[in-house]
Amino acid sequence: MAQVAKKILVTCALPYANGSIHLGHMLEHIQADIWVRFQRMRGNQVHFICADDAHGTPIMLKAQQMGIEPEQMIAEMSQEHQQDFAGFAISYDNYHSTHSDENRELSSLIYGRLKANGYIKNRTISQLYDPEKGMFLPDRFVKGTCPKCKAPEQYGDNCEVCGATYSPTELIDPKSAVSGATPVMRESEHFFFDLPAFSDMLQAWTRSGALQEQVANKMQEWFDSGLQQWDITRDAPYFGFEVPDAPGKYFYVWLDAPIGYMGAFKNLCDKRGDLDFDEFWGKDAKTDLYHFIGKDIVYFHSLFWPAMLEGSNFRKPTNLFVHGYVTVNGAKMSKSRGTFIKAGTYLKYLDADCLRYYYAAKLSSRIDDIDLNLEDFVQRVNADIVNKVVNLASRNAGFINKRFAGQLADQLADPVLYKTFTDAATSIADAYNNRESGKAIREIMALADVANRYVDEQAPWVVAKQEGRDADLHAICSMGINLFRVLMTYLKPVLPSLTERTEAFLNTELTWDSIEQPLLGHSITAFKALFNRIDLDKVNEMVASSKEDMAPATRVTGPLADDPIQETISFDDFAKVDMRIALIQQAEFVEGSDKLLKLTLELGGETRQVFSGLRSAYPDPKALEGRMTVMVANLAPRKMRFGVSEGMVMAAGPGGSDIFLLSPDSGAQPGMQVK
């Protein structure tokens, strides 16, 4: 009995419309596209949509800096984003914007239903206000000194040095990041979504078994700490949708952003005419809805979004597919090192299929970070795609074209071997379906090794020189071409451009269900080079080009310009700080934190435990073990939810991947005082 085709709606997180797409973004869109292409190959009806997230204070302020209207900026950015995704063959059925009539209508509808159902609460709050710009300041637009560790230039919601979270009003010497003015406190009435009212529903959804284990565990932490009402409004000036019947109040960007999934699909329904919006979003919808997102936005998608949908009588997602971050050469993407690579820059130098393959080979269903090691990238693509797969075709096609007029043999040389390849379809399909593309790639490449071994053992180049063995040569090379066809069918979701060239060469469409029947007595076209090797020089040029993009900014700013020297202190104040040399005995990740590393420090007779915000710069903590560093030894111990931190290690840099742990000169010993 044939399997009934599923109806599936797939979304990617909406890229923010104030910047270019980079290779970190592309991980998600490539992962989702591979899954979508596989589902389509299996006969399922998939609608794949995305949109630009086009609202919020950052977009309003950037447009002001550029001297244009926000509408013009987001329109230009949307065009750039769509061009980048097309360049990577991301097969969207529709790419829209949250700044649309559909999204305005749906945002108002959902808000109205939530309000009517008693889930919207009003209360007056106090907020920091920029008196020069005449605007309330979001947390990330306030900077000051961390109230916990005293690190300067920290954002208003959390410290990137010690990992502490706090409110912007707790910052020491806060300043507006917009004007530099000292903000003042002002009161304003805001509207809140009653998230705690949905706690039981959300916990049941979490325990249903649909979510990834890591996501469910993280959600349980949030439940244990208690859900809070969510502020869903912002005050004018703000670029977004005004709240109905509330002049001067606007929906917070994170309210209308996920509704953008619905708006983009509604726009597709209106374009197509044969799609039913309610079939995919109605309360009792039987279709599947999947969101591919990064781990940084799990909070919004696993709590607020399903609660909003439940409270407004719409269906909840079938599942969230969450992935990790991208690092480059073992470190966070860096503009100064040229590893913050824009999608458009990549496409100027390299084939999109190369990155699609490399990401696919590393992806799994877990929320693990993916490292794009550029040397390994070159070696793996050349070794796998060129040497193993494409070379299989080139080794056999020449004989078929020259000796047999492009006609494949009427019979398979080795039916048992061919069945081994087609039998693998089930396990490879399971891997793709479960988002274990790395597992699928490993199995496909193992088959490629078998295919090349077959050709090596049969040695058609030797057979071709032997009289009376034309039939053997024909059979061997036809077998090689048929094995190549099976491999490329399995790789079709990953390598769309190579697939297109392969289908032209083989003179047939590659479909999952057709591989059981080999190509016998079939005509192929003249072989042309299907794929070019990656040249490491091209990769280096791409990196250099990404550095050049940052050159003007680097010349204009500098450490002192970005981080001015603090006010003068007395020698007596300085003398109170006891800095010591410390040996890092052990460095490890902190479970539940994306920023901290746990360091075990030896001070020459005493061992300390310190939590430090170094993870973004040192993704391999073992690399720190055995290093000497400098620590503040007489800092009062601080209790954190991960344990007690007994001091602070010294580091320089603006933050993110640009944090540099201080090291003493050779000869310094653990426990020595720094004077």
From Swiss-Prot:
Domain tRNA-binding: 573-675
Gene3D superfamilies reported for this sequence: HUPs, Isoleucyl-tRNA Synthetase, Domain 1, Methionyl-tRNA synthetase, Zn-domain, Nucleic acid-binding proteins
Residues noted as binding ATP in the record, renumbered to the chain: 335
SUPFAM superfamilies in the record: Anticodon-binding domain of a subclass of class I aminoacyl-tRNA synthetases (SSF47323), Methionyl-tRNA synthetase (MetRS), Zn-domain (SSF57770), Nucleic acid-binding proteins (SSF50249), Nucleotidylyl transferase (SSF52374)
Database matches in PROSITE patterns: AA_TRNA_LIGASE_I, TRBD
Catalyzed chemical reaction(s): tRNA(Met) + L-methionine + ATP = L-methionyl-tRNA(Met) + AMP + diphosphate
E.C. no: 6.1.1.10
GO cellular component, one term: cytosol
Cofactor(s) annotated in UniProt: Zn(2+)
Gene Ontology molecular-function annotations: ATP binding; metal ion binding; methionine-tRNA ligase activity; tRNA binding
Main localization category: cytoplasm
Keywords assigned: Aminoacyl-tRNA synthetase, ATP-binding, Cytoplasm, Ligase, Metal-binding, Nucleotide-binding, Protein biosynthesis, RNA-binding, tRNA-binding, Zinc
Xref: InterPro entries: aa-tRNA-synth_I_CS, Anticodon_Met, Met-tRNA-synth_bsu_C, Met-tRNA_ligase_1, Met-tRNA_synth, Methionyl/Leucyl_tRNA_Synth, MetRS_core, MetRS_Zn
Family affiliation: Belongs to the class-I aminoacyl-tRNA synthetase family. MetG type 1 subfamily.
Protein name in UniProt: Methionine--tRNA ligase
Species: Yersinia pestis bv. Antiqua (strain Angola)
Lineage: Bacteria, Pseudomonadati, Pseudomonadota, Gammaproteobacteria, Enterobacterales
